[in-house]
Regions:
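N-terminal capping/linker segments that flank leucine-rich repeat
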Residues: 2-93, 192-194, 257, 341-343, ...
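Conserved hydrophobic beta-strand positions in leucine-rich repeat
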Residues: 72, 94-96, 113-117, 136-138, ...
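Canonical leucine-rich repeat
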Residues: 82-85, 104-106, 125, 146, ...
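Leucine-rich repeat
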Residues: 88-90, 109-112, 130-133, 140, ...
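Low-complexity, intrinsically disordered tandem-repeat tracts enriched in small residues
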Residues: 89, 102, 111, 123, ...
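Long, contiguous interaction/targeting segments characteristic
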Residues: 233, 265, 284-286, 293-296, ...
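Cellulosome-associated attachment modules in secreted, modular CAZymes
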Residues: 418-480
């Protein structure tokens, strides 16, 4: 009996003398070492990188060797798995961009501050435990969701070119830079990110964007959405505003006095007041519905693009700093660039769809009625007889063309001769024009009628023009 008790005590003593191995540690590892093998680091190329961290080349990473690793850069090495990254618990910076990763779990790398994992094939990314994370670049992947609720220290986030349908940054209150363009976002709440300075959310499906709380914002880039209303009145630090290709019908910029670059192409704008934006150097407003634009207070402007509008005159007499101008596809009849520094000009106006429609009364048109037109600067006329400021159109089925000296080069212009009373622009005056005027007025669209609908020449279009056309037709019919 004594022998059995002694044997049992001996066995217990042997067990107690053995080193303790936690359940979480691989059977191939001890608490103080990690073997550099296929089990711990299955990706051959990542394993090859890890071997370089083995300072004594014994095939094992000691605690000291692991603790020394705070920065890992394995970008562009065709790595498909970063399994084993969890052992590097002292890691603060990880660069693993331009690889073939499909998932990335960094839940054990709790000291991580900077992560660049862009241009992979990631469908999942776990950074929930990385509460120290300040910089996250995970763009150009295949992420459909991104949990950032615990990353309250995040300052820079670039998650563009993924497949995100939502993005919750309500807890990221110190976020300064957000690039989330080219996703599938239908809404974006940035109200809690009051430190935000740069917001790029273009090419999503946003219908609205509230930036009233983002008073530090100096750059907003939101093209290619479905935004109808954009209020930037609280964003007095805004220097760069790019809101093109939306559905914006009006925008107030009176409070944005430091604005230097404005791009609002392809919206539904009918007017644009930039009189207080005296710091403006770049203006791109093509593809809207402007009939005029006043740039007289914008003496620092260097670049203007206002193509595809309804602008009939453009006064650039005070824009001496202007070097680039593109104003094609407008009903302009002349252009004076003599006071500018324009060296690059795109001003061809020979497109019938956008050409100026000269309303011909009694077979003639007076060029002196055109704002800023100097007949001495016009040459190479076609389809007209010129007598001083009076032109007589030869063939109403053809456009009138001419060259014009802008002071910075010769530009080509076109006029479409339109008979007074031709309200529907079909090339003739008949009862259908009377009916068309009546329909447009009844629908409240009198302001959309062309100038040629003003048959009596009183400067406005109303039922009296329809009546005057009817009388004219009746008189001609009687005489014939």
């Amino acid at each position: 009996m004594k022998k059995k008790i002694f044997a049992g005590l001996s066995a217990l003593a042997l067990v107690l003398s053995m080193p303790f191995i936690p359940a979480s540690v691989s059977a191939e590892n001890t608490a103080s070492e990690v073997k550099i093998n296929e089990t711990n680091f299955p990706d051959e190329k990542f394993r090859g990188f890890v071997k370089k961290l083995d300072q004594n080349s014994n095939g094992i990473l000691s605690d000291t060797e692991i603790a020394a690793v705070t920065n890992i850069n394995v970008s562009g090495k065709e790595i498909s798995s970063l399994k084993g990254i969890e052992y590097f618990t002292s890691l603060t910076v990880l660069n693993c961009y331009k690889n073939q990763l499909t998932s990335l779990d960094l839940s054990q790398n709790k000291l991580l501050e900077e992560l660049e994992c862009y241009s992979n094939q990631l469908t999942s990314l776990n950074v929930r435990n990385d509460t120290n994370l300040k910089i996250l670049y995970c763009y150009n992947n295949q992420l459909t969701s991104l949990n950032l609720r615990n990353n309250t220290n995040l300052e820079q986030l670039s998650c563009y070119k993924n497949q995100l349908t939502s993005l919750n940054i309500g807890k990221n209150t110190v976020l300064e830079t957000l690039y989330c363009y080219s996703n599938q976002l239908t809404s974006l709440d940035v109200s809690q990110s009051t430190a935000l300075k740069e917001l790029v959310c273009s090419t999503n499906q946003l219908t609205s964007l509230d930036i009233s709380k983002n008073t530090a914002l100096f750059k907003l880039n939101c093209p290619g959405n479905k935004i109808e209303l954009l209020d930037v009145s609280n964003n007095k630090n805004l220097q760069y505003l790019y809101c093109d290709s939306n559905q914006i019908s009006s925008i107030e910029l009176g409070e944005n006095t430091v604005l230097s670059s404005l791009v609002c192409n392809n919206n539904n704008l009918t007017s644009l007041d930039i009189s207080r934006n005296t710091a403006l150097t770049r203006l791109r407003c093509s593809g809207n519905r402007f009939k005029s634009i006043d740039v007289s207070n914008n003496e620092k402007l260097q670049n203007i693009e206002c193509d595809y509008n309804h602008i009939t005159s453009l006064d650039l007499s005070r824009n001496t700093a202007l070097t680039n101008l593109s104003c094609t596809r407008n009903p302009l009849t002349s252009l004076d660039l003599s006071q500018t520094s324009v060296s690059k000009l795109n001003a061809d106006q020979t497109n019938k769809e956008y050409a100026y429609r000269a309303v011909i009364r009694e077979g003639k048109f007076d060029l002196s009625t055109l704002s800023g037109f100097d007949v001495s600067k016009a040459s190479d006329w076609t389809n007209v007889q010129l007598d001083g400021n009076i032109i007589t159109v030869t063939d109403f089925s053809e456009p009138v063309t001419y060259k014009y000296d802008t002071g910075k080069g010769i530009a080509s212009f076109m006029m479409i001769a339109t008979l007074a009373g031709d309200a529907n622009l079909d090339g003739k005056v008949d009862v259908r024009d009377c009916a068309y005027i009546a329909r447009m007025l009844a629908a409240g669209k009198g302001n959309e009628l062309p100038d040629s609908a003003d048959f009596n020449g009183d400067g406005k279009t109303d039922v009296r023009d329809a009546a005057a056309i009817a009388r004219f037709l009746a008189k001609n019919h009687k005489n014939n």
